[in-house]
Amino acid sequence: MHIWVDADACPNVIKDILYRASDRLKLPLTLVANQALRVHRSAYIRTVVVPRGFDVADEEIVRHIVAGDLVITADIPLAAAVLEKNSHALSPRGERYSPETIHERLRIRDMMEQLRDSGVRTGGPAALSQADRQAFANALDQLLVRA
């Protein structure tokens, strides 16, 4: 299993959890971003910097993943594309996206986008809590045990 991270919006605390898991299990971890990142030095961790632009990092990830890989992302359309390639998708809050739930998540995302486009303020996600960090670590462990 290769772990890929949609790194531009991924919280640092989640990246730290991923660095430790990558080193502990000797799994390749690739962070894809449109800017240079400071990452933990490890033989298993690398970064890929892509040009700025809409979905450029997402497309880079989808182009390289293979069945069974894991992608960390809060981006619902990217998660849907990952699932189509028989890979795993996990949010930084520990939500595991699945073929059964992704279509509903896409509908909700599209509805919220329409509301924002019509001028309704929908607010953003809450700050990442300790419970979110623990949920992520637990979900990651469950996925990696299966690998």
Swiss-Prot record:
Similarity field: Belongs to the UPF0178 family.
Name this protein carries in UniProt: UPF0178 protein AFE_3267
PANTHER family: UPF0178 PROTEIN YAII
